[in-house]
Amino acid sequence: MGDEEVQALVVDNGSGMCKAGFAGDDAPRAVFPSIVGRPRHQGVMVGMGQKDSYVGDEAQSKRGILTLKYPIEHGIVTNWDDMEKIWHHTFYNELRVAPEEHPVLLTEAPLNPKANREKMTRIMFETFNTPAMYVGIQAVLSLYASGRTTGIVLDSGDGVTHSVPIYEGYALPHAILRLDLAGRDLTDYLMKILTERGYSFTTTAEREIVRDIKEKLCYVALDFEQEMATAASSSSLEKSYELPDGQVITIGNERFRCPESLFQPSFLGMESAGIHESTFNAIMKCDVDIRKDLYANTVLSGGTTMYPGIADRMQKEITSLAPSTMKIKIVAPPERKYSVWIGGSILASLSTFQQMWISKQEYDESGPGIVHRKCF
C-alpha cells in the first residue's frame, strides 16, 4: 500500500440494506436495499432492453414484474451469485469506482461461518481483483464508532439481532447470543395487527408501506401495561397515516404493541428471550471481572434500535435483572442506524490499521484461509 492517497472502500452488507462509501467519510454515500430481482416472465418488456437482473432501488421500483430475493438471510450470505451482483452494483453503479484500485473493508455477522469469510475473501480478490481487503465484525465496528473498545453491543437490523460482548476490541465468541427476531419480523407483525383493525396489507408492495408506518410511528413503551390502559381510555396516542392512494388510516396501540415484541417475543409466537434478557444472558456468560465494564457500556446499534423509548426501556429492564448496586449505562448514538459503517470508515482510515489489510500478494501466497489469521 505505497500510495496513501488511495481511499479505501467500506461496504456493510446487511440483511435489509447495503451501506457503502469511502473510508474517512462520516456517513455512507450509498444506502440501498439488499435485494436482487429477476423478471417473473421472459420477454414481458420486449425492446425495453430488459436486463436479466436488477439490484437495490431499481429492483424495488420494478418489483411488480420481478421476483425479489434477499441474498443475506439473518445476517449471513446464503446466495453467493446474487451477493456478487450486489457487490458489482455497489462498486460500479453506486460508488462508481474500480474495485481493483481500492482496498475494500467488508463487514460480517458475528459467528459468521469460516467458509463464508473465505468465500468473501476469494470473491474480492479473484472476481473484483481488489489490491487489499479486510473483514470486520459488525458489532465490533459499532463499538469503535461509539469511541469504545470494551462494551456489549446489541445490534439489531432487519434480519437478525445479536448481543455481542467485546473486550479490548475482541468479540468474545462463547458469549455471543443470536436472536432471529428483527425488523422484518416486526414489519410482518405490524401487518398482522393492522389487519385486526380492518386494514388489509398483504402484497410485497403493501409490506413496504407498513415498514414506513413502523419507522415513522412506532415507539417502545416504558411500561407496556400502563400504555395499553392509556390507549384504551383515550385517543391521545392515536396517529393518522396517509396511504399512497390518499386513504388515511389511524393507528393507536399498534404503535407500541409492534416493537414490544422485541421485549416479549411470545407476541410473535416465539419462545425466546427478549432483547433485554439476551443482553443480560450474554453478559452473564462473560468472566465476572469484566461484567461491570459491559453493564456500563451497553451500546445499541442497527435500524431496529431506532425506536423512540428503546434506550429508557432497556435501562429499566436490565436494571431489574442486574445486581442492585451495578451501574448500568445504555448508549444510543443518534447515528446508530449506520454505526457499523461508520466504525468501518474510522478503522480503515487509521494509520495504524494500514498493516492489517490482507494484500493481494498475501492472498496469492496463502489462499483464502489467510482471512482467519488477519481478521479476528
Curated annotation (Swiss-Prot):
Keywords: ATP-binding, Cytoplasm, Cytoskeleton, Hydrolase, Nucleotide-binding. GO terms for cellular component: cytoplasm; cytoskeleton. One of its GO terms (molecular function) is ATP binding. It is found in: Cytoplasm, Cytoskeleton. It catalyses: ATP + H2O = ADP + phosphate + H(+). Its EC number is 3.6.4.-. Belongs to the actin family. This is Actin-2. It comes from Dibothriocephalus dendriticus. The gene is ACT2.
